[in-house]
């Protein structure tokens, strides 16, 4: 009689991948998914299916399961929670053994956690809400090339947020006119100017010419002001080889900082560029273009707090974070949550900010959040309150739209920033008393006075689409 070694056929996922009594290990990578199951699929089966498809499972029993220690390598759904106010979906907590993932590879992590499982028929919608990376995995990743303190030392700027501006119009300027716009902003008081995310090397402005004219602007502004200046030179390119070519040229001409679009450019390219920046003493600004395709739908995709953690592991010294008060999507408490994720060494679970797990970053440097998108001088008190000193406040139209020109717009923002910081340091509640603080400063700054008059009626009062589920236990 033949020996039967395994039971062929399809089994319920819950039989193998649902373990409500599992004790989480310090070395496990933990994930929480918001799952909207198909009709007729119960919660335990849906959670187990996600655990299986994002780890070792397939749709049927296979004999090769006997050739490995499946019980060690599998993902385990270990807890289910209600989503407050929405009975169509639920939270599933899943633990993955660290050995499922290649060391230092955010590419490999995402290939499992947000790979084929997102097309799985057992679920109608699936969203990765948060991930806990154990310190054992964090230490395998390079992280930010330099971090906040090293950037302050390189740029010789302390005690306040840094001030930036994205050059507009974002497309269409010649390289010479682009450099002129940078110079006017930098001499007016900005610390940085910036390429926009889609400025690469187009027919109207090739990258090398842009780099040359921008560096001329930086050097001239530094000579006039006595301050260190910079411009985020976007090295995002069609191929990694071309990206490194542009980065090398930026280093050759003396640029202190370059820029990369980490989602459209790719996580592999970003990690490589971060390593290059670390080795070559170059700061790295990260733009999040395409993030809203992934994170804005509250039921399907990847929450931005996860994209933030992935970026900190992959590497970047700056990351766009939204503004709360500007034109772009961003719930206040959720934004404060991912700002903490960027900067702090240890973040406690805080459901009021959407943080599901403790996260220990060890000695990994922090990332400076960048507030950008539809902001102007009237927003300065709120921005300084929300973001604090270790941030970049970046005004594009709020600088270049000044009736007196770029330099005046930069001067208005610099005066507003320093007035808010000085008032805050005296104990003034600047978010409440901001109007009085700015009005007093404007008595000595005609540039600020005109800026306040120009933008006094400009507000972006659309409701946030992706709101926190506030009634967590």
Swiss-Prot record:
Top EC class, one word: lyase
Catalytic activity: 2 (2R)-3-phosphoglycerate + 2 H(+) = D-ribulose 1,5-bisphosphate + CO2 + H2O; D-ribulose 1,5-bisphosphate + O2 = 2-phosphoglycolate + (2R)-3-phosphoglycerate + 2 H(+)
Cofactor: Mg(2+)
Modified residues annotated as N6-carboxylysine in this record: 194
Top-level division of the source organism's lineage: Bacteria
GO biological process: reductive pentose-phosphate cycle
SUPFAM superfamilies per the UniProt record, alphabetical: RuBisCo, C-terminal domain, RuBisCO, large subunit, small (N-terminal) domain
Cofactor note: Binds 1 Mg(2+) ion per subunit.
Chain residues that bind Mg(2+): 194, 196-197
InterPro entries given in the database record: RuBisCO, RuBisCo_large_chain_AS, RuBisCO_lsu_C, RuBisCO_lsu_C_sf, RuBisCO_lsu_fd_N, RuBisCO_lsu_N_sf, RuBisCO_lsuI
Gene3D superfamilies: Ribulose bisphosphate carboxylase, large subunit, C-terminal domain (3.20.20.110), RuBisCO large subunit, N-terminal domain (3.30.70.150)
UniProt-listed Enzyme Commission number(s): 4.1.1.39
Site (Transition state stabilizer): 327
Positions annotated to bind substrate: 116, 166, 170, 288, 320, 372
Keyword Magnesium recorded: yes
GO terms of molecular function: magnesium ion binding; monooxygenase activity; ribulose-bisphosphate carboxylase activity
Active site (record annotation): 168 (proton acceptor), 287 (proton acceptor)
Keywords: Calvin cycle, Carbon dioxide fixation, Lyase, Magnesium, Metal-binding, Monooxygenase, Oxidoreductase
Keyword flag Magnesium: yes
Function: RuBisCO catalyzes two reactions: the carboxylation of D-ribulose 1,5-bisphosphate, the primary event in carbon dioxide fixation, as well as the oxidative fragmentation of the pentose substrate. Both reactions occur simultaneously and in competition at the same active site.
Further facts: The basic functional RuBisCO is composed of a large chain homodimer in a 'head-to-tail' conformation. In form I RuBisCO this homodimer is arranged in a barrel-like tetramer with the small subunits forming a tetrameric 'cap' on each end of the 'barrel'.
Subunit-structure text: Heterohexadecamer of 8 large chains and 8 small chains.
Protein family according to the UniProt entry: Belongs to the RuBisCO large chain family. Type I subfamily.
Name assigned to this protein: Ribulose bisphosphate carboxylase large chain 2
């Amino acid at each position: 009689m033949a020996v039967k070694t395994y039971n062929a056929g399809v089994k319920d996922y819950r039989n193998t991948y649902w373990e409500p009594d599992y004790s989480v290990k310090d070395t496990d990578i933990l994930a929480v998914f918001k799952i909207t199951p198909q009709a007729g699929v119960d919660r335990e089966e849906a959670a187990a299916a996600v655990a299986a498809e994002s780890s070792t499972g397939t749709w049927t029993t296979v004999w090769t399961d006997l050739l490995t220690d499946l019980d060690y390598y599998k993902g385990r759904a270990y807890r289910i929670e209600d989503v407050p106010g929405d009975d169509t979906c639920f939270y599933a907590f899943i633990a993955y053994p660290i050995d499922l993932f290649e060391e230092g590879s955010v590419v490999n992590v995402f290939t499992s956690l947000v790979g084929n499982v997102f097309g799985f028929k057992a679920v109608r919608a699936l969203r990765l809400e948060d991930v806990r990376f154990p310190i054992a995995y964090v230490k395998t990743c390079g992280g930010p090339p330099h971090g906040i303190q090293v950037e302050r030392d390189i740029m010789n700027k302390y005690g306040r947020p840094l001030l930036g501006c994205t050059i507009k119009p974002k497309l269409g300027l010649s390289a010479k006119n682009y450099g002129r716009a940078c110079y006017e902003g930098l001499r007016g008081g900005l610390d940085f100017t910036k390429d926009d995310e889609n400025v690469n090397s187009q027919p109207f402005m090739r990258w090398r010419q842009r780099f040359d004219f921008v560096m001329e602007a930086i050097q001239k502004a530094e000579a006039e002001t006595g301050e260190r200046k910079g411009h985020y030179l976007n090295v995002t390119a069609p191929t990694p080889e071309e990206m490194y070519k542009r980065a090398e040229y930026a280093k050759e001409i003396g640029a202190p900082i370059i820029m990369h679009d980490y989602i459209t450019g790719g996580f592999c390219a970003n990690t490589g560029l971060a390593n290059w920046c670390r080795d070559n003493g170059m700061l790295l600004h990260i733009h999040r273009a395409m993030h809203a395709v992934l994170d804005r739908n509250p039921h399907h995709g990847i929450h931005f707090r996860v994209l933030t953690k992935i970026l900190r592991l992959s590497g970047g010294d700056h990351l766009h974070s939204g503004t709360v008060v500007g034109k772009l999507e961003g719930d206040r408490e959720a934004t404060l949550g991912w700002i903490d994720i960027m900067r702090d060494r240890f973040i406690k679970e805080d459901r009021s900010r959407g943080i599901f797990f403790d996260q220990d970053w060890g000695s990994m440097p922090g990332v400076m959040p960048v507030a950008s998108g539809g902001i102007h001088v009237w927003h300065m008190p709120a921005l300084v309150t929300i973001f604090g000193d270790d941030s970049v406040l970046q005004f594009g139209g709020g600088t270049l739209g000044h009736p007196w020109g770029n330099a005046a717009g930069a001067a208005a923002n610099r005066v507003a920033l320093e007035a808010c910081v000085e008032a805050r340091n005296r104990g003034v509640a600047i978010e409440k008393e901001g109007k009085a603080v700015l009005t007093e400063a404007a008595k000595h700054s005609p540039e600020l006075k005109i800026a306040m008059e120009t933008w006094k009626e400009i507000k972006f009062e659309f409701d946030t689409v992706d709101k926190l589920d506030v009634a967590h236990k």
